[in-house]
Amino acid sequence: MKSRQNFSLSGNIVDLIANSIFKGTVYIEDGIIRKIVKQEVKEDHYILPGLIDSHIHIESSMLIPSEFAKLAVVHGTVATVSDPHEIANVLGIDGIKYMISNGNKVPFKFYFGASACVPATPFETSGFQFHEAEMEELLGMKEIKYLSEMMNFPGVINRDPWEMKKIEIARNHNKPIDGHAPGITSDDARKYAEAGITTDHECFSMKEALDKIEYGMKIQIREGSAAKNFDALIDLMQEHED
């Protein structure tokens, strides 16, 4: 059995930067890639960097993070960017801390954010509510990497004081702010982006995506088990490779 820290892999190496594939061997020492050698090898499988799922709610899988990781990694996913707002709406900060601690049990990278919508709407009964103190605590944690999706996009567009306070706290902690604003274009997209929102995974049309890109947002093309936007947006790759 190979050491987890020292081993080599041979096969077809996929170079994502040069957009090429070549035969060779990757040498790992102390858990770090030390060198890559182009050479003829008998192995014919493909070696490429692990995938990062840039938007997923672990709780939707009905699995705890450590068990989710065991299933995801065999399909090439080695990391996720995850908003734990489902457990946060039930258990609050304790729920988020559980997700972090459980995820730390496996060699899989979970990048958790501070849930922006607890509760998700003012019309439901949730198990917990986040106020300014909770947002300060979460965004002050090194394990929390960003302010999770700002789903109350009408509130952001209309500069609702509480929505803007969340954004202010994130900025004070130098944390980026994820978006969630389906269908907005033109002036609404501009106002949303100007509030400090950096990403959006909720685009349905090319116009919507292009408007958001124009105002400085990064667009994530979603092709999930429910919402599927790949066909509508894939042409973005021709002019916006980054």
What are these regions (language model features)?
Residues 45-69:
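Di-metal (Zn2+ and/or Mg2+/Mn2+) metal-binding site signature of metallo-dependent hydrolases
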Residues 39-45, 196:
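Active-site regions of enzymes building and remodeling cell-envelope glycoconjugates
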Residues 1-40:
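N-terminal metal-binding scaffold of metallo-dependent hydrolase/deaminase domains
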Residues 129-149, 155-242:
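Histidine/acidic residue-rich metal-binding segments in metalloenzymes
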Residues 69-174:
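Divalent-metal coordination cores built from histidine and acidic residues
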Residues 61-63, 88-90, 226-227:
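Acidic-and-aromatic substrate-binding clefts and catalytic sites of carbohydrate-active enzymes
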